[in-house]
């Protein structure tokens, strides 16, 4: 079974979300998602300053197997992207919850967090797949 850190929130589309000390949220794809995709070859990052709505596709992870859209788990403004992925997309595989993060977002409606899954609910989703 994939590693599912308890402190994160999760989307049904296999993104994770972590609240940072400055009030922004870091977003990436889960270990399960990167296992399904296989070795990353490119990550198309969103534009810093872009405004997105929850559920919008805002990035693309391209692997040796497929290209997969990455969705914004909450609405808000993209405030940072992980430029390290330009040279090292494999960080998504090796460190999905650390160095392989994809973007940071300043949430415009924190009530949307309530629709995300906690670790227990996400693990149950994985068991049903």
Swiss-Prot record:
HAMAP family: GcvH
This protein's record includes keyword Transferase: no
Cofactor: record remark: Binds 1 lipoyl cofactor covalently.
Chain positions found as N6-lipoyllysine: 65
Cited InterPro entries: 2-oxoA_DH_lipoyl-BS, Biotin_lipoyl, GCV_H, GCV_H/Fam206, GCV_H_sub, Single_hybrid_motif
Superkingdom assignment: Bacteria
Pfam families associated with the record: GCV_H
Role, per record: The glycine cleavage system catalyzes the degradation of glycine. The H protein shuttles the methylamine group of glycine from the P protein to the T protein.
Cofactor: (R)-lipoate
CDD domains per UniProt: GCS_H
Span of domain Lipoyl-binding: 24-106
Record has Nucleus as a keyword: no
Keywords on record: Lipoyl
SUPFAM superfamilies: Single hybrid motif (SSF51230)
Any GO BP annotation: glycine decarboxylation via glycine cleavage system
Protein family membership: Belongs to the GcvH family.
One of the record's GO cellular component terms: cytoplasm
Subunit description: The glycine cleavage system is composed of four proteins: P, T, L and H.
Name of the protein: Glycine cleavage system H protein
